Regions:
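Metal-dependent active-site segment of extracytoplasmic phospho-/sulfohydrolases and closely related
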Residues: 54-55, 304-346
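N-terminal export signals
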Residues: 5-26
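Acidic, His- and aromatic-enriched active-site or binding-groove loops in soluble protein domains
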Residues: 121, 127, 175-209
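Short, structured active-site-proximal loop/turn typified by the sulfatase FGly-forming signature C/S-X-P-X-R
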Residues: 66-106, 155-157, 376
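Substrate-binding rim/cap in mid-to-C-terminal beta-strand-loop elements of soluble/periplasmic
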Residues: 109-121, 348-393
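Polar, surface-exposed loop/tail segments
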Residues: 380, 384, 394-409
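Active-site-proximal N-terminal segment of extracellular/periplasmic enzymes that hydrolyze or transfer
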Residues: 30-88
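Active-site His/acidic residue clusters
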Residues: 64, 70, 170-174, 241-252, ...
Length: 409
């Protein structure tokens, strides 16, 4: 075969193949199949053989250096030496918030990573300076919990700081299968003030112009959670009864009850006695006051959280409802910088490597948590915490990251 014949024949074959290719492309393609709808069974009673879980958000941003890296110099001796070493659990000293585009090492974002088990980009919806009004699109751990188990909203509890009001409204997502029906309930001074104002108006404490001003104030406070159109939908009689007892004990001035993270400890202790939550998240945050400068604000705040965890642990041991049936999960919302050029190296948390580096501790009875004397050094992600709690309590977290911390034990 000469060159001319070869080109003629191969050209004919190529043209035939090309025409077949275009003919195939011209044929109508089958439509893409939509994803399978998320169909979930009806909620079931919470099993008696499953534990209560207390999630300690070691908030405000803390470094490993002052907490778990040097046990002999730790500012949280109870958490490390008692909760972990003596009472038994698993320490994950090599946890991080993954360095991805749009992933932020800050308090609100870190809290939502913990709640949803997903790294996500969040944008403030209020358009106010420094505001962090974020709306999770994926279900929160409390929604997973209440969708799987027939538990009341006050049994799925967040204890929140008076200084981070935006975090009051991370109680449910916009997910169509979950959402407000499976929300958590919040205890905070903001909620207490709302309760007092609503009660005052109902009991005719004000009149005339002052009454109109107070009604507008209450409307503004309630409307901060713009997604709740019907206030009766989120009314919880058990919470109202809780605040009435709080009022009888502490009054309304705010000068008698503890403040800062000590307040969160006190609210948690009251909640355990009055409400008996099965899943409770405590959003500590005072270490963040180091933004103002003095390093003692930071180290002292770590010690205050540690003391609070000790009080809460002792309360679980004194209460048959919680004794030998409660798992503690301790994890920071984010780390802090280690900037040696600053007078206080850990003053901020500006996306540095150290700000991404955190840890986690899980402690509880051996039937729920492995007791390992040696830390698990394998790299872990903050978002693994969600699946871990679901595994411990026996409920699925379908849209969260599928990895559990316990897989590394």
């Amino acid at each position: 075969m000469n060159r001319r014949d070869f080109l003629h024949k191969t050209g004919a074959v190529g043209a035939a193949g090309l025409s077949l290719s275009f003919a195939y492309q011209d044929q109508p393609q089958p439509p893409a199949q939509p994803p399978e709808p998320l169909v979930l069974p009806d909620p079931i009673p919470y099993p008696q053989d499953k534990p209560n879980v207390i999630l300690i958000r070691f908030g405000g941003g803390v470094r490993r250096r002052e907490t778990v890296e040097f046990p002999e110099r730790t500012y949280c001796p109870f958490i490390y030496h008692e909760l972990y070493e003596r009472h038994g659990g698993v320490l994950f000293p090599n946890m991080e918030i993954e360095s991805l585009d749009g992933i932020v090492t800050s308090h609100a974002q870190g809290t939502l990573y913990l709640l949803t088990g997903k790294y996500d980009r969040y944008q403030d919806i209020s358009s106010k300076p420094l505001a962090e009004r974020f709306v999770p699109q994926a279900p929160t751990i409390f929604e997973y919990f209440r969708r799987h188990y027939a538990v009341k909203s006050h049994e799925a509890l967040i204890v929140n700081s008076e200084d981070r009001i935006d975090e009051e409204f991370y109680t449910f997502s916009n997910h169509h299968v979950y959402g407000i029906r499976y929300r958590s309930t919040v205890l905070s001074l903001y909620r207490y003030k709302t309760f007092l104002l609503r009660n005052d108006i109902a009991n005719n404490r004000y009149e005339g112009r002052e009454l109109e001003e107070k009604r507008r104030e209450l409307e503004q406070m309630e409307n901060r959670d713009y997604r709740v159109e019907n206030r009766n939908l989120v009314a919880v009689p058990e919470i109202d009864a809780f605040w009435r007892k709080w009022h009888e004990h502490y009054g309304r001035s705010g000068l008698v009850n503890p403040r800062g993270d000590r307040l969160l400890t006190t609210l948690s202790l009251w909640a355990m006695r009055e409400l008996k939550p099965k899943l409770m998240m405590i959003n500590y945050q005072d270490p963040d006051y180091v933004h103002w400068g003095p390093r003692q604000f930071y180290t002292r705040a770590i010690s205050i959280i540690d003391e609070g965890v000790r009080e809460i642990y002792n309360a679980t041991q004194a209460d048959p409802y919680y004794r030998d049936n409660t798992v503690f999960v301790v994890v920071p919302d984010c780390g802090r910088d280690s900037n040696r050029s600053m007078p206080v190296p850990f003053q901020h948390h500006f996306q540095s490597r150290s700000a991404h580096q955190i840890f986690a501790l899980i402690a509880g009875p051996r039937r729920f948590v492995p007791h390992q004397r040696r830390p698990v050094d394998e790299l872990q992600q903050q978002i693994y915490v969600t699946k871990t709690i679901g595994q411990i309590m026996g409920f699925p977290t379908q849209l969260a990251n599928e990895r559990s911390l316990l897989a590394a034990t």
